[in-house]
Amino acid sequence: MKRNLMVLSYDYDLSKELAKILAETFSMRFFDQIEMFNFHNVPRDVSSMYKECGEDYTKKKLRSVVKMEIDFDDSVFVADIGLVDNCSDLFLKLKHSNFIIFLYKDTADEINDLKAKEYATPEEKALFSSDENLLNKRKLVVSSELADSRVNITGLSIDEIINEVIASIKDYYAVD
């Protein structure tokens, strides 16, 4: 039985908003992987660690945050889809205890969103950004190997997205 929910999307802010609503709806705890990383690595955040320690060390520390989630119960996680590249083996382990919800848009819309997306620092962009080839690769991996639910959110409002996600959860667990 899957004990947690995880929301993955290229729109991190939307994923975070949805995850908070799901946590409230199902009386679960909410966790943001990036906030967990920052908390466990005070005084450094992702950007400052990348500057001071380099990409490899930062990715190793990000992996440790994902690894922690294996021990959680009754929680909703929001994860940056960029972590899938560095932690695909861990995400496959998380799949056993997490109902993974993949929110996606039509490819053309996602490419436009990625081009327009702004990052707080160049370091965040280096860690979490995607080009068109990487977008398609991640989309294939997440959709075929990780996701329990795939919801096309192109043109949907937040309320419609919530309804679609809750319907997919109910369908998965075969409840009304």
Give the positions of each predicted feature.
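Glycine-rich phosphate-binding loop used to anchor ATP phosphates in small-molecule kinases
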Residues: 57-97
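C-terminal alpha-helix
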Residues: 164-175
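Conserved phosphate-donor/acceptor-positioning beta-strand/loop module used by diverse small-molecule
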Residues: 94-117
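Pre-Walker A (Motif I) flank of P-loop NTPase domains
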Residues: 2-5, 73-74
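Glycine-rich phosphate-binding P-loop
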Residues: 5-23
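Small-molecule kinase domains that catalyze NTP-dependent phosphoryl transfer to phosphate-bearing small molecules
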Residues: 60, 120-164
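Conserved substrate/cofactor phosphate-moiety recognition/catalytic segment
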Residues: 24-63
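Short glycine-rich anion-binding loops that position phosphate/pyrophosphate groups of nucleotides
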Residues: 81-84, 106-108, 156
